């Protein structure tokens, strides 16, 4: 989103070490980090410090933009996502389905009826073409296995059956500045992921996998493959699908998250989208990202009942326990998505009577909102705190909620991968800030406390 002319200008820097002054251009309230490389110390002879120039230290990349994007912004009036310039409210008004949102986010245009139908059919065809080896690999896992290793194994099995999909094996670049190949690969990746999730869901439930139908939409096929159908009609509940579509708009992307960053880093070496997806999902499964939902469920289960919430919150305040789903790096105050998420729970008639753990979550929310420890720090429930209950209301089992979430986020993943394939490629090569010794005698005995030090005792 272009900013006003006030966001353009120059940054004047005076280096107190040398008394030199520098001008650094400001464009759209952003400066180019590489411009700081010209700020260095005068030295004689060879100098690594001079060669590198001034570095920017930004642990966690809290204030670093890694690329320009046209995919997602924020609606200043609501704080909700602005997807390719289209408001969330407009997309909800249109009852936007997966195909339409995928086209908007990945290809950059809202599809016509003909384009939507062609994309719907292409998704279904790719779903039906997934080789049997994918299911065979997934079924080698015990049904009780966590989803992540099953997902990565299933996606890897697909890659092994289609080596021409992989640029390095193909002999070089396939997708960069090749929009037709990139579009087809993005569509195929989303279809393959849906099949993998369906196979995993059925394997864990011990039910037969029902393949995709070319007459149905992406979401209808997803729910069918996952076994989330009415026993009488063998079709998904249309009301549940309608609420799921609303969730797509808020959950399909959330800007440069940690998983999107990892995906873009992988894409910068010109990897195929399935390899990029594997890296993003693996990164996201940590308890500080998407893994927070599964960790949150297990925490609620451990608390056990609402009357034990005060004791749990005291443990949190003593930093003995972690409260997942509270606070957000993007939203400093109230998460603007939260009201929508709570509304979907009401639409699905899902409350603490249907799910006892929700009573514990509501008690945490109620007490934390009255506790100065949380309020003074601006810590409030974010959308993820209640999103796990929404996915439970959709019908997904607790341990599949993170994996099911990626069925929405895959739109954003593919949008960022597709955008990277259009832009100039610069392979990610960050720097680190070395603070270790300048020289060290390797023969000198270490005083460390690691496993090798313990072995010497």
UniProtKB/Swiss-Prot annotation:
It comes from the Eukaryota. InterPro entries: Citrate_synth-like_lrg_a-sub, Citrate_synth-like_sm_a-sub, Citrate_synthase, Citrate_synthase_sf. Phomoidrides A and B (also known as CP-225,917 and CP-263,114) are potent inhibitors of Ras farnesyltransferase and squalene synthase. CP-225,917 and CP-263,114 inhibit Ras farnesyl transferase from rat brain with IC(50) values of 6 uM and 20 uoM, respectively. CP-225,917 inhibits squalene synthase with an IC(50) value of 43 uM and CP-263,114 with an IC(50) of 160 uM. GO terms for molecular function: citrate (Si)-synthase activity. Its EC number is 2.3.3.-. It holds the Pfam family Citrate_synt. Belongs to the citrate synthase family. Gene3D superfamilies: Citrate Synthase, domain 1, Cytochrome P450-Terp, domain 2. Keywords: Transferase. The lineage of its organism: Eukaryota, Fungi. GO terms for cellular component: mitochondrial matrix. The gene is phiJ. Alkylcitrate synthase; part of the gene cluster that mediates the biosynthesis of the antihypercholesterolemic agents phomoidrides which are dimeric anhydrides. Within the pathway, the alkylcitrate synthase (ACS) phiJ and the alkylcitrate dehydratase (ACDH) phiI produce the decarboxylated monomeric anhydrides by coupling the C12-fatty acyl product from phiA with oxalacetic acid. The pathway begins with the highly reducing polyketide synthase phiA that catalyzes the formation of a C12-fatty acyl-ACP, starting from one acetate and 5 malonate units. Induction: expression is induced under low pH conditions. It catalyses: (2E,10E)-dode-2,10-dicenoyl-CoA + oxaloacetate + H2O = (4E,11E)-2-hydroxytrideca-4,11-dien-1,2,3-tricarboxylate + CoA + H(+). One of its GO terms (biological process) is tricarboxylic acid cycle. Pathway: Secondary metabolite biosynthesis. This is Alkylcitrate synthase phiJ. The active site is at 328, 384.
């Amino acid at each position: 989103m272009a900013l006003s002319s006030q966001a353009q200008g120059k940054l004047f820097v005076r280096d107190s070490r040398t008394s030199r002054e520098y001008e650094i251009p400001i464009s759209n309230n952003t400066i180019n980090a590489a411009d700081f490389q010209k700020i260095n110390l005068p030295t004689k002879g060879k100098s690594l410090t001079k060669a590198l120039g001034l570095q920017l230290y930004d642990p966690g990349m809290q204030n670093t933009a890694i690329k320009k994007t046209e995919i997602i912004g924020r609606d200043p009036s609501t704080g909700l996502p602005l997807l390719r310039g289209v408001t969330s409210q407009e997309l909800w008004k249109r009852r936007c389905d997966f195909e339409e949102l995928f086209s908007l986010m990945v290809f950059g245009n809202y599809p016509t009826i003909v384009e939507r139908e062609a994309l719907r059919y292409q998704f279904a065809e790719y779903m039906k073409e997934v080789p049997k080896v994918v299911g065979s690999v997934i079924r080698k896992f015990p049904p009780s296995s966590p989803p992540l290793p099953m997902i990565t194994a299933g996606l890897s099995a697909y890659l092994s059956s289609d080596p021409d999909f992989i640029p390095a094996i193909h002999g070089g670049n396939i997708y960069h500045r090749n929009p037709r190949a990139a579009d087809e690969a993005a569509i195929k990746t989303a279809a393959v992921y849906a099949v993998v999730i369906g196979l995993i869901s059925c394997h864990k439930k011990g039910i037969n996998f029902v393949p995709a139908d070319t007459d149905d939409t992406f979401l209808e096929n997803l729910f069918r493959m996952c076994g989330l159908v009415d026993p009488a009609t063998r079709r998904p509940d249309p009301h549940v699908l309608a609420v799921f579509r609303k969730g797509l708009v808020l959950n399909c992307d959330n800007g440069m998250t940690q998983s999107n960053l990892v995906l873009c880093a992988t894409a910068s070496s010109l990897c195929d989208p399935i390899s990029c997806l594997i890296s993003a999902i693996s990164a996201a499964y940590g308890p500080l990202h998407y893994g927070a939902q599964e960790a949150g469920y297990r925490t609620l289960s451990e608390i056990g009942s609402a009357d034990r919430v005060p004791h749990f919150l005291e443990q949190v305040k003593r930093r003995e326990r972690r409260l997942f789903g509270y606070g957000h790096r993007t939203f400093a105050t109230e998460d603007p998505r939260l009201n929508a998420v709570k509304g979907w729970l009401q639409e699905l008639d899902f409350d603490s009577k249907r799910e006892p753990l929700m009573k514990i979550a509501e008690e945490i929310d109620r007490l934390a909102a009255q506790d100065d420890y949380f309020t003074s720090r601006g810590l409030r429930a974010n959308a993820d705190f209640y999103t796990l209950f929404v996915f439970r209301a959709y019908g997904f089992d607790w341990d599949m909620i993170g994996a099911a979430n990626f069925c929405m986020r895959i739109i954003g993943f593919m949008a960022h991968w597709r955008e990277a394939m259009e832009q100039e490629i610069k392979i990610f090569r960050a720097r680190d800030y070395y603070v270790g010794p300048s020289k060290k005698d390797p023969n000198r005995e270490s005083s460390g406390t690691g496993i090798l030090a313990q072995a010497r005792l």
